[in-house]
């Protein structure tokens, strides 16, 4: 679909606690964990690690244990680890397509000292995943999570020459550990219950960065299908927020960041098929933005939590919306006028919630039809005193190799990141511009 998104697969999702139940001793040894590691346990709290992206903390009714759910794509925890072994207990579910049985598990990415070493799917229920196995850490088998049914969750292991460091029991290793949620909550959730280390280990948060950016967007921001090919059907294995323009731009600028992005979403309508004529309004960004994660809360019957806008105060908010609205507006004047009005109101609301932030509206890589409306909205808002700028994206040329469903490939996403990085350096971060601020 060259100008839209695919629909979320129809299916039912059980709460992870239901998937984790066993006949006896569920609270002590949940499904997937035959034994908790000896040593120390660490809660996923701000005192132990840096937490970026919106997160929801929920206490399980059956277990009484707290889990910190990473909400939107690109959310992560990061800390400096000194020790010998490190593992993480995670709780998850997945969406299953009722038509063909395709499963859409959550995908995570593990970085050690800022190098990607592994992408792996989460299994439903609660499982223990080794992040830095002790001793035999250079062997691929060491990456398999504990599963009583014998299924491994090895994932994609990337080579890192110094992964194990010195295997001597006398030596401790020190490195920066970053665990990132790569895929979307509409497909699968990911909750962190605890990290486990050896007895002598220490964990401490990494430093916060001076620059802070928030990205609001749709599947392009999520990295939908970015790891796939045109002939591939979408799967969460092909989705990677880290390979999309937003995260790449933030990393190039050495900025802390958070994403509020959702495939298929729009301002006045989600993506609809050409044969449909009514807008799809069940999940729209202006309403979603006000809550920490209304989709996750609705799935599990939790009360929606209002987002605390004081918890992350960006200098820049980047908005990438309109591609899915175009599937409904279709060049019809009345619909486009409504889009422009609602777009303006949403930007005003973003400004009210983030009064210290500059706002950048970017658009055009997959669809050009609503570009004049976005530009007109930006001009009107700027004239009324809202600190907003327009960044026009280079459209994908006909015949360009794409990712899944006509979405930008990794190469196109990289070009988008380079363009936006340069724009932000020239327009926003002029005073602290550095010559080495670029994507390597």
PLM regions and their residue ranges:
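Structural recognition of the beta-strand scaffold that forms the well-ordered cores
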Residues: 212-216, 221, 257-261, 315-320, ...
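Conserved SGNH/GDSL esterase-like catalytic core that processes O-acyl groups on lipids
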Residues: 226, 231-333, 337, 365-375, ...
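Conserved, well-ordered alpha-helix/loop/beta-strand core segments that scaffold catalytic motifs
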Residues: 320-322, 347-349, 359-361, 367-370, ...
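N-terminal secretory targeting modules
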Residues: 1-4, 31-143, 149, 154, ...
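Aromatic/hydrophobic pocket-lining residues that form the small-molecule binding cavity
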Residues: 339, 343, 413
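Catalytic His-Asp segment of secreted/periplasmic serine-dependent ester chemistry enzymes
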Residues: 365-440
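Generic structural signal for well-ordered alpha-helices
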Residues: 343-347, 375
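A structural motif corresponding to the C-terminal end of an alpha-helix
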Residues: 246-256, 349-358, 378-385
